[in-house]
Structure formats: C-alpha cells, structure tokens
Amino acid sequence: MIINHNMSAMYSNRVLGVTNLAQAKDMEKLSSGMKINRAGDDASGLAVSEKMRSQIRGLNQASRNAQNGISFIQVSEGYLQETTDIMHRIRELAVQSSNGIYSDEDRMQIQVEVSQLVAEVDRIASHAQFNGMNMLTGRFARATGENTVTGSMWLHIGANMDQRMQVFIGTMTAMAVGVREIGSEKVMSIAAPDDANRAIGTIDEGLKKINKQRADLGAYQNRLEMTVKGLDVAAENTQAAESTIRDTDMAKQMVDFTKNRILAQAGTAMLAQANVTTQNVLTLLQ
C-alpha cells in the first residue's frame, strides 16, 4: 500500500474530467438544438453545412427576385391593357369615319377624339413606370435596325452566378404603334373616308404588336411562376439536408446526456471512495 500516488483516485479523476466534458457538450447541443456549434465539433460537417446555408439563402432571395419579376410583368401588362383599349376605340372611330354618311364636320369631331386618344397612348407610355424606371419607352426593348440602344430587364432567378433571364418590352408610344407619324407630331388622320380606311389597317398592325408583347409577357410570367415553385422546393430540400447535418437529434442527445450524467455521479462517488481508501493507511500508523 502506497500513499504518495493514489492511482485509483488519479484514474477516477481523469475519467470524471472526460465525462464532465462530454456532459457539457451534451448540454450545449441540447440547449442550442445543433450538434455542430463550432468547427471542432465536426470540421467537414461545418464546411458542408455553411455551403448549404449560403445556397439556401441564395435560393430564397432568387425566389423573391422571381416574384418581383412577376410584379414587374403584371404592371407592364396592366399598362398595355389600357393601351389596347384605347387602340380598340381608335379603330372603332376609324371604322365609323370610313362610312360615307358622315360629313367633313362630323369627321372633324371624330378626329378631335382620335387626337386625344393618341395623346393618351403617349402619356401611358411615358408615365408607365416600375420602381422609377420607364417600361414602355424602349428601355427594355430588343435591338433592332432602328433601335440599337437597349437595356433588357435582367432577372436573377438562381442562387449562383449567371443564373438569370432577360425580359424584353418593346416601345409602345403612339409613334411605335402607328397612330402618330414617324418623325413628327402629326396624329393619324381619319378626316377623309380613304384616310380612315387606311387607318384601320395601320391600327390592326399596331394591335398585333401590342398583342405580341402581351403574349410575351404572359409567357415570361408563366415561366417565372414555375421558377418560383422550383426554387421553393429546392430551398426546402436543401434545408432538410442541412438540418440532417447540423441539427441535434434531441432524443439521441438526451440519451447521451443521461448516460454521461450517471457516469459523472458514479465517477464522483468513486473518486470520493478512492480518497477514503488512502486514509486507511493511518490505521497502520496508530
């Protein structure tokens, strides 16, 4: 029997320290709900988890971007609906003026209304804005022979670089849709039956252009709606994968915590018992 080194107490103390450390980690994981709280808990798991978190946030923002794009398209289509209604009215007046029963004075009165409607087409084009950006004046138009200055609307609809799409909106001024002469302020004339007759064909071409643009906007919107669904599903699945890596399994962790708590209590008792054992040496000295 020796008294300088109590090996039983030293062993019990070492094991108790390990158990207390494990118990502290269990408490940390249970209180935070995460099994990876620092790089030391799982270095590779932390790296993968952080990449996934970045991707999840990117996917969520991309979904919001796509939803904002849908709003942009809906606003544009709303303005074009107004322009379409005006064009229908101008066409109706042109058909009316083509009829030979009207006098020149009658057609003059019809022309007054047409002039006001054409001015309204220009007003809509110049005032149609989204977040301060003009939408129908050619800012987002495709490059053509007449229009080489373009700036299509880019919508970033992915979590990573270059995952984006373009939205094009043509010029929808009165001149662009044919109800005002190119290069002048002169309004389409329906002052004579022949003029009114030709105007009907011109207006039909303008309506084709507007309807084509509205159809394009509808296609953009349908695509973006599907994009939002896909992004939301991707974010959800990535979140589930990240949760598997990083989140604590509370039931399993509670089992480990209970085990370590019992071991800590037993270790404390055994350490006390080991210290008592050395005191028995005193009986030999009495």
UniProtKB/Swiss-Prot annotation:
The keyword Signal does not apply. GO terms for molecular function: structural molecule activity. Glycosylated. Glycosylation is not essential for motility. Disulfide bonds: none annotated. The keyword Electron transport does not apply. It comes from the Bacteria. Keywords: Bacterial flagellum, Glycoprotein, Periplasm. The core of the flagellum consists of several antigenically related polypeptides. Belongs to the bacterial flagellin family. Component of the core of the flagella. This is Flagellar filament 31.3 kDa core protein.
